[in-house]
From Swiss-Prot:
Secretion signal span: none
Subcellular location field: Cytoplasm, Nucleoid
Annotated family: Belongs to the YejK family.
Lineage: Bacteria, Pseudomonadati, Pseudomonadota, Gammaproteobacteria, Enterobacterales
Organism name: Sodalis glossinidius (strain morsitans)
Gene Ontology CC annotations of this record: bacterial nucleoid; cytoplasm
Single annotated GO MF: single-stranded RNA binding
Pfam families attached to this UniProt entry: NA37 (PF04245)
Keywords: Cytoplasm
Protein name as annotated: Nucleoid-associated protein SG1574
The keyword Iron is assigned to this record: no
Domain of life: Bacteria
Coiled-coil portions: none
Length: 334
């Protein structure tokens, strides 16, 4: 599917010292060339594949007001982007890990949905070989490692103002999280908690199995069914839909999974994004601490792996060959 760019603008922040980020602002929007289209298509693809947090604008959000004004035609896109870059610089300059970069604002359409993407892209050095086979240095935008990115689903924001998921941004960074200062720049509050939704789903599945009085084998089959559906949705870039998931599971006492989860008050949305790490708990047990790391398939519990909660002891029958080899060699002093 093609990505159609409406407007795009680039600016730069140059780090002069620990407290100063200098601005270099474009006087004209960027022309939409094939190279620009390829860049945005790649940025959209990379961003879509990453784990994101959801937010909503607060009533005091200056950025939200500026976007509304721009959308109404009260301010042109370039002027909006220049002002917003200044606010972003002021916010980033408060933190010791602030770095310069190319600031990108792009309004585009993808699959009949309008988006506004804001990103700060770092620059990397590389080597270039020309037609004469001479080598020279070159620079490129480090799109694949971009971690300061936010995207507004303009269509959802304007048509469903009560939504809790029209604003997304990337999570996590060494030190203070990117999400923290980007939330300050966006003047946004936490929106849909994807991990909480997925944890709620796992709890609902376990309770559903308990209510049906399923044995361990049947319980694991249900968990595998749920995991398979959620994995397919994740790979397709689609949300988990309770009505679809419910259709894959056998009813309990003539009650569907969707009806069960609604009556039990798990507060699950009708649709929500899949969280890979949380959903892995459907088919795996994993944990680490005190120098020990364990990870095994859930169906092995009670078959080859046994846990005694009274003594907090885990017994493993049949160790992996590579581990057994290491233990044997260490015991024999080799």
């Amino acid at each position: 599917m093609s990505l159609d760019i409406d407007q795009i603008a680039l600016h730069q922040m140059i780090k002069l010292d620990e407290q100063t980020l200098e601005l270099v602002l474009r006087d004209t929007p960027l022309d939409v060339s094939p190279a620009v289209e390829d860049m945005m298509a790649e940025l959209h693809r990379v961003y879509s594949a990453k784990s994101k947090a959801y937010g909503i604008f607060t009533p005091e959000s200056e950025l939200a007001d500026a976007v509304r004004s721009c959308r109404r035609g009260n301010e042109n896109f370039l002027a909006f982007s220049r002002t917003a870059t200044g606010r972003l610089r002021d916010e980033l300059a408060k933190y010791p890990f602030a770095e310069g970069g190319t600031v990108l604002f792009c309004q585009y359409r993808y699959l009949a949905v309008e988006y506004l993407l804001i990103a700060v892209l770092g620059t990397c050095q590389s080597m270039l070989v020309n037609e004469q086979l001479d080598i020279s240095s070159t620079q490129y935008l480090d799109i694949h490692h971009a971690d300061i990115v936010a995207c507004i689903d303009l269509t959802e924001w304007e048509t469903q103002p009560a939504s809790t998921r029209y604003l997304t941004f990337l999570k996590g960074r060494v030190g203070r999280k990117v999400s923290d200062f980007f939330m300050d720049f966006l003047a946004a509050a936490e929106g849909l908690d994807t991990k909480a939704q997925n944890r709620g789903l796992l709890q609902a599945v376990d309770d559903y199995c308990t209510d049906a009085a399923l044995d361990n084998r049947q319980r694991q089959e249900v968990r595998q069914q749920v995991h398979s559906y959620c994995k397919e949705q994740l790979q397709a870039g689609e949300d988990i839909a309770l009505v679809e998931l419910s259709a894959t599971l056998a009813p309990v006492s003539d009650k569907t999974f969707q009806a069960f989860s609604s009556e039990q008050g798990y507060a699950l949305e009708e649709t929500f994004p899949a969280d890979r790490g949380t959903l892995l708990q459907l088919t795996k047990y994993a944990g680490s601490g005190g120098g020990v790391t364990l990870n095994f398939d859930a169906h092995l519990l009670g078959e080859r792996i046994f846990w005694d909660p009274a003594t907090d002891t885990l017994t493993i029958k049949g160790t992996p060959p590579n581990l057994r080899d290491q233990l044997t060699r260490r015991q024999n002093g080799k």
